[in-house]
Amino acid sequence: MALMDIGFFSESLGMAVHCMALVPHARDGEVLPRRQTLYLLHGYGDSYTSWIRKTNLERYAAHHNLAVIMPDAQKSAYTDMSHGGKFFTYIADELPAKMRAFLPLSERREDTFIAGFSMGGYGALKIGLARPTQYAAIGCISAGVSNDTPDTAALRELRTGGRLLKDTEEDVPASIARAAALGEAAPRIYHTIGQEDFLLSSARETRDLLCSYPGDPFHYIYEEKPGKHGWEFCDGALRDFLQWLSPAPR
């Protein structure tokens, strides 16, 4: 696996940014197709380096021959902020186009996935469901549609400035309804959380919402397992998500 720290200018954010990339490399003389790609989002208080530093991601990705892109979203909740950057637009639209220009990544929907932990799990649901024709599968680890807690509530004003997200492309319940209407073309969703996680009630509310659509359009998997909100649980959840996503190495 090649590990890269990629710096470039983001037009959406109006500033220089960095992301981490893991890309499988070819053996001598081997010609490989453009790579299946996972966009992997960090949680509140973490950064674009956290997945590499705190999990066994590289080993898991190598086993599945999967490229992984890890952007930085600060504490944005993957939102186009009223008093800050347009992180939703950056990660939903600009980042995939830039990465495919820089790296040998597949442009096919069936080869493109998004997942995240905590705030990143919320972001993966938000972006994956708002762009259902772009992602074949979504992984939500230790999160739900609403992740508000007392320590993050003060950021709501910076993120939205009182702006209502209802009926916008950042309205996750509305995106769920639109994606569900696609039927078999909707993204698959894998959702897991620890039984001692402080966001468990949010995850269960999200489970109930996703399960309310007839016909299981998301081929939805929901799992509660022993564990708290942290990297020890997240590492195992990442391994399980990738096994669900791609049972056999490519």
Residue spans for each PLM region:
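Non-catalytic cap/lid and distal C-terminal segments of serine-dependent acyl enzymes
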Residues: 1-250
